[in-house]
C-alpha cells in the first residue's frame, strides 16, 4: 500500500489561489477513479476536482471556506502499489459560475483551518455524541426540513462525521412516535439558540460584488408608474392564439423588446464603465442580464443579442437560461458579458425597489408587481393594470435627465405596445 497526494491544480487564467467550497468525501471514504472529491471556486467559476486514482481517503487538506494556494496539498489517498506519488489533477469546470454564483455553504462550528484533517488509524471519522447545549451540526437543507416539520435538531441523533445530522437521521427520527422521539410540544417559550453560518462560496462572491458595487458606483434610482393594461391584453391574446404551439409569453420578453428599442436613442445607457482605465464602452449589441434567484443565490444569465431575437425566440431563451441558472447548469459564458440587466421579483415585486447596478454595467431596470388600481383618465375614474419600474443608474456615466428620458421612452413603448414592433 502507498500514499497518493493530490495537489490543488492550476485552474488557469493566472489564478494563484482558490477557495475550497465543499468536500464530497470524508476521511475513511473509499473513492473511485475520476470521482469528484471537492468543489473549489475562482473569481469566475466553480470547478470540480476529480481524483485520478481510486483508494481510501487518509486526509483532507483544508476546510470549506479556506483559501488555498495552487500547488498546495489538497487530499491524501491510500492506494494499491508503491504510492508516494504527487499528482495535480485536471480541474473540471462545473456548470456554476462564481459571481454572481456555487455550492451552498454548510454551517460549521468555529473551526480553524488546519493543514489537513487526518485520522491516526486512517479510519472514517467517528460519531461524536452531542453534549447538552451543543449546537447540532447539519446542512442548510436538513435544517430547513427540520424547521418545516417542527423538529428541534438537538433531539436528533447524528450519524455523520463529528455527529453531523444527515437526511437519513432526520428520516429515522420522523418515523418514530413523537413520545418515543422525545420531541417537546410546541409552545410559547424563550429561544436562546443561534447559528453561525460561514460566508463562503457563492455567498462570499455575492457579498463582495454587492459591496464593491455600492462602494464604487454613484447610484441613483428613478421610479416610473406604467399603465400596462393594453400590454397585458396583447400578451393574453397572443398566448390564447399561439401559446400552445409557441409557448406562453410572460411580460419579460416584452420588457426586453422595450429596452432594445429605447436603447437605440440612449447608447450611453447600453454601456460598461472601466473606472480604473477611465473608459466607457458603448455596445451595439444588447446583451440583457436576467437576474434570477436560485437555491444557491442570485445569478444573472445573459440573453445575448436581444436586438436580433423575435418575441418568441427571446422568450424561449429567457426561459432556458433561467431554468439553467436555477438548476446550477448555466455555463460560464451564459453568465457573463451583459450590457444591461433586468430584474424582477414577479408577484413579490412590491411597489418600489432600489436595485444595485450590476457592474461594470451602468444601468439596471427593476420590475415591480402589477396591480389593478383606480386611475383618472379624461376626468373619469377607471380601473387599470398598473406597474412600476424601479431603475438604478451609475451617475458617473448616466445623467439624471438621460435616465429619466430613457425610462419615459420605455414607458411609452409598454403603454402603446404596437410601437414595440414598428421599425
Swiss-Prot record:
InterPro entries: 2-oxoA_DH_lipoyl-BS, 2-oxoacid_DH_actylTfrase, 2-oxoacid_DH_E2_comp, Biotin_lipoyl, CAT-like_dom_sf, E3-bd_dom_sf, PSBD, Single_hybrid_motif. GO terms for molecular function: acetyltransferase activity; dihydrolipoyllysine-residue (2-methylpropanoyl)transferase activity; lipoic acid binding. The keyword Lyase does not apply. GO terms for cellular component: cytoplasm. The active site is at residues 395, 399. It comes from the Bacteria. Residues 137-174 form the Peripheral subunit-binding (PSBD) domain. Binds 1 lipoyl cofactor covalently. Its EC number is 2.3.1.168. It holds the Pfam family 2-oxoacid_dh. Residues 3-78 form the Lipoyl-binding domain. Keywords: Acyltransferase, Glycolysis, Lipoyl, Transferase. SUPFAM superfamilies: CoA-dependent acyltransferases, Peripheral subunit-binding domain of 2-oxo acid dehydrogenase complex, Single hybrid motif. It catalyses: N(6)-[(R)-dihydrolipoyl]-L-lysyl-[protein] + 2-methylpropanoyl-CoA = N(6)-[(R)-S(8)-2-methylpropanoyldihydrolipoyl]-L-lysyl-[protein] + CoA. Forms a 24-polypeptide structural core with octahedral symmetry. The branched-chain alpha-keto dehydrogenase complex catalyzes the overall conversion of alpha-keto acids to acyl-CoA and CO(2). It contains multiple copies of three enzymatic components: branched-chain alpha-keto acid decarboxylase (E1), lipoamide acyltransferase (E2) and lipoamide dehydrogenase (E3). Belongs to the 2-oxoacid dehydrogenase family. This is Lipoamide acyltransferase component of branched-chain alpha-keto acid dehydrogenase complex. It comes from Pseudomonas putida. The lineage of its organism: Bacteria, Pseudomonadati, Pseudomonadota, Gammaproteobacteria, Pseudomonadales. The gene is bkdB.
Amino acid at each position: 500500500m502507498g500514499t497518493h497526494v493530490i495537489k490543488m491544480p492550476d485552474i488557469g487564467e493566472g489564478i494563484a489561489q482558490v477557495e475550497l467550497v465543499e468536500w464530497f468525501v470524508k476521511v475513511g471514504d473509499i473513492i473511485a477513479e475520476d470521482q469528484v472529491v471537492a468543489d473549489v471556486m475562482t473569481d469566475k467559476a466553480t470547478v470540480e476536482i476529480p481524483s485520478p486514482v481510486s483508494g481510501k481517503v487518509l486526509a483532507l487538506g483544508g476546510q470549506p471556506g479556506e483559501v488555498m494556494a495552487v500547488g498546495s496539498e489538497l487530499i491524501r489517498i491510500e492506494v494499491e502499489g508503491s504510492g508516494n506519488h504527487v499528482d495535480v489533477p485536471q480541474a473540471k469546470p462545473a456548470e456554476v459560475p462564481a459571481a454572481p454564483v456555487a455550492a451552498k455553504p454548510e454551517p460549521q462550528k468555529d473551526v480553524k483551518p488546519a493543514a489537513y484533517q487526518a485520522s491516526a488509524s486512517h479510519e472514517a471519522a467517528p460519531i461524536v455524541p452531542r453534549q447538552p447545549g451543543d449546537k447540532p451540526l447539519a446542512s442548510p437543507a436538513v435544517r430547513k426540513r427540520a424547521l418545516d416539520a417542527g423538529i428541534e435538531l438537538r433531539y436528533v441523533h447524528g450519524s455523520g462525521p463529528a455527529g453531523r445530522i444527515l437526511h437519513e437521521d432526520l428520516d429515522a427520527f420522523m418515523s418514530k412516535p413523537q413520545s418515543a422521539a422525545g420531541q417537546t410540544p410546541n409552545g410559547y417559550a424563550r429561544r436562546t439558540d443561534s447559528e453561525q453560518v460561514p460566508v463562503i462560496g457563492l455567498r462570499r462572491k455575492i457579498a463582495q460584488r454587492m459591496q464593491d458595487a455600492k462602494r464604487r458606483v454613484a447610484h441613483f434610482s428613478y421610479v416610473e408608474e406604467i399603465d400596462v393594461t393594453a400590454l397585458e391584453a396583447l400578451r393574453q391574446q397572443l398566448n390564447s392564439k399561439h401559446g400552445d404551439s409557441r409557448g406562453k409569453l410572460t411580460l419579460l420578453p416584452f420588457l426586453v423588446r422595450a429596452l432594445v428599442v429605447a436603447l437605440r436613442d440612449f447608447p450611453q445607457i447600453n454601456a460598461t464603465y472601466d473606472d480604473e482605465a477611465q473608459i466607457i464602452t458603448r455596445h451595439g449589441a444588447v446583451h440583457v442580464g436576467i437576474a434570477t434567484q436560485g437555491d444557491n443565490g442570485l445569478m444573472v444569465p445573459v440573453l445575448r443579442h436581444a436586438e436580433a431575437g423575435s418575441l418568441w425566440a427571446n422568450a424561449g431563451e429567457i426561459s432556458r437560461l433561467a431554468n439553467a441558472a436555477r438548476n446550477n447548469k448555466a455555463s460560464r459564458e451564459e453568465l457573463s458579458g451583459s450590457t444591461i440587466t433586468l430584474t424582477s421579483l414577479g408577484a413579490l415585486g412590491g411597489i418600489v425597489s432600489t436595485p444595485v447596478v450590476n457592474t461594470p454595467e451602468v444601468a439596471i431596470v427593476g420590475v415591480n408587481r402589477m396591480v389593478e388600481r383606480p386611475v383618472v383618465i379624461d376626468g373619469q375614474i377607471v380601473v387599470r393594470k398598473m406597474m412600476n419600474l424601479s431603475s438604478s443608474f451609475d451617475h458617473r456615466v448616466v445623467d439624471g435627465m438621460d435616465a429619466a428620458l430613457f425610462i419615459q421612452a420605455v414607458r411609452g413603448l409598454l403603454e402603446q405596445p404596437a410601437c414595440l414592433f414598428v421599425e
